[in-house]
Regions:
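Mid-length scaffold segments of soluble, non-membrane domains
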Residues: 79, 83-129
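Bacterial N-terminal signal peptides that target proteins for export
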Residues: 2-13
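C-terminal motif of bacterial Sec signal peptides marking the signal peptidase cleavage site
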Residues: 19-23
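Post-signal peptide N-terminal segment of mature Sec-exported envelope proteins
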Residues: 33-58
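Bacterial signal peptide processing site
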Residues: 25-28
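Transition segment at domain starts
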Residues: 50-86
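Helix-rich interaction surfaces within compact, conserved domain-sized segments
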Residues: 40, 128-188
């Protein structure tokens, strides 16, 4: 066979390869996407409000002057993940919340009950709905920390707002003592 035949075959294969690559933009899920509007988000962004990611539980009888030595347990809201379903003007949210507790200097026992909230807010900070949940965290004997993955399901009205305009926010429902404590003592 002559070299001319090989060159013709190579040119033909190269042309076919270019045709295949060019057609990728016409195959769904490959290549260039449609130039229409981007897909709507499936779920609002879920965030833990940093100032409310920590809480403290104090020994009974703690007076007006709260000190770190009075802390029985610290609560740490460490992670949140959400999946959603939209039905008209209603948002059904399935949440997994990772909540930990740590023994404080005044710890008694192994269990602590903490309260956290989940809310749906609009981009202008309007609260469209809020739900509170209680969770018990058990700390194993001789351990400093324990944690739970608390799964909850909530339904919020969206007030007709698009999902892209909404946020899911969460944090601990702070007691007046905890608010005062964190004003005076930074950190945990």
């Amino acid at each position: 066979m002559s070299t001319g035949w090989y060159r013709s075959a190579a040119a033909l294969l190269a042309a076919m390869g270019l045709a295949v690559l060019a057609s990728c933009s016409y195959i769904p899920f490959v290549g260039k996407k449609s130039e229409g509007q981007p897909a709507a988000p499936a779920c609002p962004i879920a965030v833990i409000l940093r100032p409310l990611a920590n809480t403290a539980v104090f020994r009974p009888g703690t007076g007006a002057e709260i000190r770190p030595i009075d802390v029985m347990f610290y609560g740490i809201y460490s992670d949140i993940s959400a999946s959603c379903q939209v039905n008209g003007a209603t948002l059904r949210v399935s949440l997994d919340n990772v909540i930990a507790a740590e023994r404080g200097p005044a710890a008694q026992g192994n269990d602590v009950d903490l309260t956290y909230f989940v809310s749906l807010t609009a981009s202008d900070q309007t609260v469209l709905g809020k739900k509170s949940f209680g969770v018990r965290v058990s700390i194993p004997d001789r351990a400093k920390r324990g944690g739970v993955n608390d799964h909850v399901e909530v339904v919020f009205p969206t007030a007709g707002r698009p999902i892209a305009d909404l946020n899911i926010t969460a944090g601990f429902q702070e007691s007046p003592q905890a608010i005062q404590f964190y004003k005076n003592y930074r950190g945990r």
